């Protein structure tokens, strides 16, 4: 008789189904035509009805099934009676069939921290740049990102009426990453993906030092990591505070599971324990290959300006 799935694999299987539901909610809000936009701190820091509904859906669905989890979400929402339509109780069967890496087989529910970004790329969502948008559910153990799920609600949205809309990517360190086709960036090219809406002199100085052949300015940390694993960019360079732990936790897992690397600008691993500060104050540097080339070119002036 096969052993029952471990806590980690059950959690990932749930997160997959919950992320798929989240993608449906994101599309429904657009279809209904009222985004319910609120400015949180400034004109580039927005929250929509989709952010609010998806956060309630993800956090409530996870908390009901895994009550001992620590769940940290981007949006501050008042406690409310949850609409049952927002609850997802399913678990993706294909994930439950996968073996749990042995180093995680004895993990208890209370040892895990889940970082949730209900809508990564909110500004782009409000502007109709729908392929930039992702839903991110990252899972951390002992401060390290070990499993993650990314839903792209509008994947294929420009591929014609017969295309399947949306996809869900998932991964576990030691097992692999699934739901996409791994592709290398063009050999010998330095293609940088970076922020679309949070540019600064530091960001510009750091990118210039990389001697880029091309610079892609797009929204969403999840979207930028997907560009790396699908060969559209060589490095994600963001020499600035701004992105948070819920932006990087899930994408980092997917990248690391296929041999890539994500750190801060100093080369330090990011920490995801529940007490950690939410801001990635020393920026982000990520690559699928050739990490050392990009890390070696970060100017000392940039490092001096960004304190971990």
UniProtKB/Swiss-Prot annotation:
Binding sites annotated in the UniProt record for Mg(2+) 3: 74
A Gene Ontology molecular function term of the record: inositol-1,4-bisphosphate 1-phosphatase activity
Cofactor comment text: Binds 3 Mg(2+) ions per subunit.
Positions bound to AMP: 195, 198, 220, 224
Cofactor(s) required for function per UniProt: Mg(2+)
Entry-annotated residues carrying N6-succinyllysine: 244
Amino-acid positions noted as binding Mg(2+) 1 in the UniProt annotation, renumbered to this chain: 74, 117, 119
Name of protein: 3'(2'),5'-bisphosphate nucleotidase 1
Protein encoded by which gene: BPNT1
């Amino acid at each position: 008789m096969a052993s029952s799935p471990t806590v980690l694999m059950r959690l990932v299987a749930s997160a997959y189904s919950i992320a798929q539901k989240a993608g449906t909610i994101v599309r429904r809000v657009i279809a209904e035509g009222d985004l319910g936009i609120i400015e949180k701190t400034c004109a580039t820091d927005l929250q929509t009805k989709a952010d609010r509904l998806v956060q309630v859906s993800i956090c409530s669905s996870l908390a009901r099934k895994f009550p001992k989890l620590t769940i940290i979400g981007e949006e501050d929402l008042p406690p409310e009676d949850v609409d049952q339509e927002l609850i997802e109780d399913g678990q993706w069967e294909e994930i439950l069939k996968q073996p749990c890496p042995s180093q995680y087989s004895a993990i208890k529910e209370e040892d895990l921290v889940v970082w949730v970004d209900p809508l990564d790329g909110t500004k782009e969502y409000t502007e109709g740049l729908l392929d930039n948008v992702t839903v991110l559910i990252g899972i951390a153990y002992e401060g390290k990102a070990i499993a993650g799920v990314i839903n792209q609600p509008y994947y294929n949205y420009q591929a014609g009426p017969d295309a399947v809309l949306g996809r869900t990517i998932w991964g576990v360190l030691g097992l692999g990453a699934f739901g996409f086709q791994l592709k290398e960036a063009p050999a010998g090219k330095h293609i940088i993906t970076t922020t679309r809406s949070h540019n600064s002199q530091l960001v510009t100085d750091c990118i210039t030092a990389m001697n880029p052949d091309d610079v892609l300015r797009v929204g969403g940390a999840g979207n930028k990591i997907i560009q790396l694993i699908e060969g559209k960019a060589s490095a994600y360079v963001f020499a600035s505070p701004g992105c948070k732990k819920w932006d990087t936790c899930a994408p980092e897992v997917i990248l690391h599971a296929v041999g890539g690397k994500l750190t801060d600008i100093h080369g330090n691993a990011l920490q995801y324990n529940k007490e950690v500060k939410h801001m990635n104050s020393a920026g982000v540097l990520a690559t699928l290959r050739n990490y050392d080339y990009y890390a070696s070119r970060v100017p000392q002036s940039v490092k001096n300006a960004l304190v971990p």
